Amino acid sequence: MVVFSQVTVALTCFSAIASAAAVRQEPPQGFTVNQVQKAVPGTRTVNLPGLYANALVKYGATVPATVHAAAVSGSAITTPEADDVEYLTPVTIGSSTLNLDFDTGSADLWVFSSELTSSQQSGHDVYNVGSLGTKLSGASWSISYGDGSSASGDVYKDTVTVGGVKATGQAVEAAKKISSQFLQDKNNDGLLGMAFSSINTVSPTPQKTFFDTVKSSLGEPLFAVTLQGTGRPWHLRFGYIDSDKYTGTLAYADVDDSDGFWSFTADSYKIGTGAAGKSITGIADTGTTLLLLDSSIVTGLLQEGYPGSQNSSSAGGYIFPCSATLPDFTVTINGYDAVVPGKYINFAPVSTGSSSCYGGIQSNSGIGFSIFGDIFLKSQYVVFDSEGPRLGFAAQA
């Protein structure tokens, strides 16, 4: 999930893909990437309705006026657990090492760069564009977000290494212009997109993602993720499945990648101990903090946990007392019950010191599918397998 304190990427779909080269990895079994966290002064804050608005824009949904107003005004600024908001991965690009936000809901690798002003670079590790890379002539990129923020720049080809996995000639989108909203989160230096290359936003020719470049060099063309919160480290593994990280048997769901996302269908859902509901189609997205569902499911779950739950115009989303005990939310995938503990749904106070909390689940604003963001994913061991393609789910060990 791209945070930069307030943002998540909005995408445009393209059809053609440019090429990059993988370097054959030894040994071929795979590599592990561990979490990093930069030590920066001050307290990191997060714009909660900004997170929500940006997730909606990312998937082409209409942002309700109340959510937009709350996001722009910054009326719900808070400090949740660090690992509940963003998942950073150390990435070496040329001679520079940056901490990038790991995002399975986008297909761009874009970074803070030496093309920014010195004040914009302050506190960030940046990609030195004059070091080893080669500028891709005529190529550019530009993104905009639900809170009004934006970034754009040039494209370079360079060597990119993540946890020992190396791609040569990888497209790197170097920020040349950036709005002020991006500068607040000093931990985060950019984005590592891991969706399908068909939605890469480089113009005029979309580029391959890092994963699509390197997957042929791995023992298996997959990556596996263990997202965790409350200060525990998370892990990203390329090329192999680590049986020590999950319990039981992996349950697989077919992926529909026609729109460029890791989209799957769960057989049913359940609120608490209630009856099973209908099937749910959604996207597995590490780049979205929240779990976005049909509004009827959201209201049903929150009303069961606290009858006074409300969709607050001032907070820009569903809120409830922080003391409320919320029911678990379960989705069944090929016979496996993936459980989101109720405590995860109680995400964060709407503002520092508030007794009202912002819901970790929010409405999908009628887009017709769900977004299985970090609120869901951090309770699971998840395998993103390009063969099929398919997704594997199991309870974390």
UniProtKB/Swiss-Prot annotation:
Secreted aspartic endopeptidase that allows assimilation of proteinaceous substrates. The scissile peptide bond is attacked by a nucleophilic water molecule activated by two aspartic residues in the active site. Shows a broad primary substrate specificity. Favors hydrophobic residues at the P1 and P1' positions, but can also activate trypsinogen and hydrolyze the B chain of insulin between positions 'Gly-20' and 'Glu-21'. Induction: Repressed by alkaline pH and in presence of ammonia. GO terms for cellular component: extracellular region. It is found in: Secreted. Its EC number is 3.4.23.20. Residues 21-71 form a propeptide. Keywords: Aspartyl protease, Disulfide bond, Glycoprotein, Hydrolase, Protease, Secreted, Signal, Zymogen. The active site is at D103, D285. Glycans are attached at N311. InterPro entries: Aspartic_peptidase_A1 (IPR001461), Aspartic_peptidase_AS (IPR001969), Aspergillopepsin-like_cat_dom (IPR034163), PEPTIDASE_A1 (IPR033121), Peptidase_aspartic_dom_sf (IPR021109). Optimum temperature is 50 degrees Celsius. This is Penicillopepsin-1. Residues 87-394 form the Peptidase A1 domain. It is an enzyme of class 3 (hydrolase). Optimum pH is 3.5. Residues 1-20 form the signal peptide.
